[in-house]
């Protein structure tokens, strides 16, 4: 058995410590997420070391035996946490979150969680969703995909070398060349994807492979002990190199944040730092990183780092539902302690017995059988639960349709005094939190069928842009411009347009108002901020150049936006100068807390008007711009169909109004259609 690298255990302890502290207290360590990059470098080094030794010894790699070892090492603990998460989701989580949780548990069992999150993260709205109980499995998915891909690449590289008739040393050389080639491609992809699609770039495997490669290439670098230098010089360089690695990691952890374009170039800091520690860290020198990592507590944390990583996130997600409030210092410390205790128990009773089984169980076939059984159980349970929830939601949708057909007292129509509806805020059988949580316009509405509204303006010709309603001979063409608060109005606006001979042209990009300028942001701009500025300028240019657009309706969420009312006035004046009428949409009232409407209603015992609230009179740059005395802009206001007197409502006409804390549910938004259209016509008078 090879000697255990104590410095690697220390590096693992550092990595898991960074991640856990970041998840518990992100404001204290804004870049702690780089801990996962350290894990990737370690994995690349260790796995490549093992595979290259096997190549040196046998001339090839036994894929079955390699994968069996990975199964025994990783899956028992992972499956344990997934089973726990499944049971906890069904018992503890609100019904509105169960479907997302069980679906992602199934994806995690298949080690596809990173691709699920990448798909969801295309839209910042998806990031607004409550994080699932197994969201952290994205990193394990990347690792497992690497473990599948890496040995296959090595086998192919060896086969190619032999076909080319190289000498006996060529297998090792072929592996090194393959690593370099794949690493370069992956790094370039990472840089490009981080600049062009940063949300999904964070999760997908191709943007992360180069981090494994950096670790793997260390296997082919001559050991520092073999470098031709005097012992004192070697020790001095080793000490400096090790602490440089620590410094790079700590700088990234301290100064990176959610606005740092990542991975891309920025990931070089923690990746190179981890590589330096792996290369120079194996040292007994006093006060070297390697010697410090020999302390028993650090070694223990390194030993249980995998299990601690698995357990800490479900505990973080479950805490507020168990204790009724978000955790602060003491709650965070309790999660930390429980994670360590569970990590110790998991290693002793699950990981170690699985890694070192009895002889009759130490077979490749047994490992694969265990994997298949675990995957089938978890995906089967996940799939069955998802199907049950979907069936329940279809039943709710049918009841809602029946309610709509049964009369005028449905959805927003109950707020119309002409309908004289009784009990407008009553909780009925159609008020279902689980249904509302999934009642999202991007999954049910027009936006689920196309992507043209989300593409850069310069990449979409005017004829190909999202156009709806009467596209051939419209009486009026209205351009809808803005962020996700424009997008949740697309379907009700188009429904009205179809019966009034309007054409609707959509310019939308979630998170961007179309009114930002470079000066609105701190410099330098992040990739997302630069995208907003460019998209806004392109949108304005196209709208002004088009003679077929009559009205431009801007709809945005003011919360968290940096756009100024002064610049909005300037933009609107320029658009008006090109012959268009400009309208500003008053934002829908937002919930007073981060709790979603489905969650609040599920937790409420009120059968009438649950979770109603008095809205805050927050500043709104759109309304400020519309009220400019020198250049006023008409306002489209539908708040009378969301609020009565000084109270706003989460249940109206048998429907839950929001699917989260600020976006209208698809079904309720559709019920607003006639009133949205009427409000636009009133603003045009």
Regions found by a protein language model. Give the residues of each.
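Membrane-interface helix/loop caps of multi-pass membrane proteins
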Residues: 1-379, 656-658
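Extracellular/periplasmic envelope-modification machinery, especially enzymes
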Residues: 258, 323-330, 340-341, 348, ...
């Amino acid at each position: 058995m090879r000697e255990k690298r104590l410095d690697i255990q220390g590096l693992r302890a550092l990595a898991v410590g960074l991640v856990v502290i970041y998840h518990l207290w992100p404001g204290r360590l804004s870049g702690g997420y780089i801990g996962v990059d350290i894990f990737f470098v370690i994995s690349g080094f260790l796995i490549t070391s093992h595979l290259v030794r096997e190549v040196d010894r046998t001339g090839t790699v036994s894929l079955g035996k390699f994968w069996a070892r990975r199964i025994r090492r990783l899956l028992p603990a992972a499956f344990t946490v997934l089973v726990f998460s499944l049971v906890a989701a069904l018992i503890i989580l609100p019904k509105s979150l169960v479907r997302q949780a069980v679906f992602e548990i199934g994806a995690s069992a298949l080690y596809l969680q990173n691709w699920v999150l990448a798909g969801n993260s295309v839209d910042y709205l998806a990031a607004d969703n409550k994080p699932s109980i197994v969201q952290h499995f994205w990193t394990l998915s990347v690792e497992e995909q690497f473990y599948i891909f890496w040995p296959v690449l090595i086998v192919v590289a060896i086969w190619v070398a032999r076909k080319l008739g190289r000498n006996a040393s060529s297998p090792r050389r072929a592996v090194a060349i393959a690593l370099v080639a794949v690493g370069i491609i992956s790094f370039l992809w990472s840089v490009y994807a981080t600049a062009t699609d940063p949300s999904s770039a964070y999760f997908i495997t191709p943007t992360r492979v180069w981090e494994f490669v950096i670790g793997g290439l260390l296997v082919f670098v001559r050991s520092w002990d073999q470098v031709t230098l005097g012992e004192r010089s070697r020790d001095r360089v080793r000490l400096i190199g090790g602490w440089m690695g620590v410094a790079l990691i700590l700088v990234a952890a301290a100064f990176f944040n959610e606005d740092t374009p990542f991975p891309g170039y920025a990931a070089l800091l923690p990746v190179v730092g981890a590589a330096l520690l792996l290369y120079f860290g194996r040292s007994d020198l006093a006060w070297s990183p390697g010697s410090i990592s020999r302390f028993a507590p650090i070694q223990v944390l390194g030993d249980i780092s995998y299990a601690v990583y698995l357990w800490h996130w479900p505990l973080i997600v479950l805490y507020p539902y168990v204790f009724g409030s978000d955790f602060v210092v003491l709650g965070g410390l309790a999660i930390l302690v429980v994670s360590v205790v569970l990590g110790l128990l998991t290693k002793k009773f699950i990981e170690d017995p699985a890694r070192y089984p009895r002889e009759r169980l130490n077979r490749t076939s047994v490992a694969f059988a265990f994997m298949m059984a675990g995957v089938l159980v978890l995906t089967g349970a996940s799939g069955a639960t998802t199907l049950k929830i979907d069936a329940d939601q279809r039943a709710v949708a049918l009841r809602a349709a029946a309610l709509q057909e049964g009369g005028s007292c449905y959805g927003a129509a109950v707020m119309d005094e002409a309908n004289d509806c009784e009990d407008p805020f009553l909780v009925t059988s159609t008020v279902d939190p689980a249904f509302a949580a999934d009642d999202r316009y991007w999954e049910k509405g027009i936006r689920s069928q196309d992507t043209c509204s989300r593409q850069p303006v310069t990449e979409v010709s005017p004829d190909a842009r999202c156009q709806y309603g009467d596209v051939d001979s419209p009486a009026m063409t209205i351009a809808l411009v803005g962020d996700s608060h424009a997008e949740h109005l697309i379907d009700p606006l188009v429904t009205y347009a179809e019966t009034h001979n309007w054409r609707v042209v959509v310019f939308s990009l979630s998170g961007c108002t179309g009114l930002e300028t470079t000066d609105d942001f701190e410099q330098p701009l992040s990739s997302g901020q630069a995208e907003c500025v460019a998209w806004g300028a392109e949108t304005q240019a196209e709208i002004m150049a088009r003679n077929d657009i009559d009205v431009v309706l801007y709809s945005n969420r003011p919360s968290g936006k940096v756009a100024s009312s002064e610049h909005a006035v300037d933009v609107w004046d320029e658009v008006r100068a090109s012959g268009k009428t400009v309208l500003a949409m008053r934002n829908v009232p937002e919930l007073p807390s981060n709790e979603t409407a489905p969650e609040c209603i599920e937790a409420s015992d009120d059968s009438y008007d649950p979770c109603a609230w008095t809205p805050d009179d927050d500043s709104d740059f759109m309304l400020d711009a519309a009220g400019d005395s020198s250049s006023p802009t008409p306002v489209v206001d539908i708040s009378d169909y969301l609020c009565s007197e000084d109270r706003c409502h989460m249940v109206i006409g048998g429907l839950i109004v929001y699917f989260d804390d600020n976006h209208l549910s698809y079904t309720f938004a559709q019920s607003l259609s006639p009133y949205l259209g009427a409000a636009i016509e009133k603003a045009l008078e």
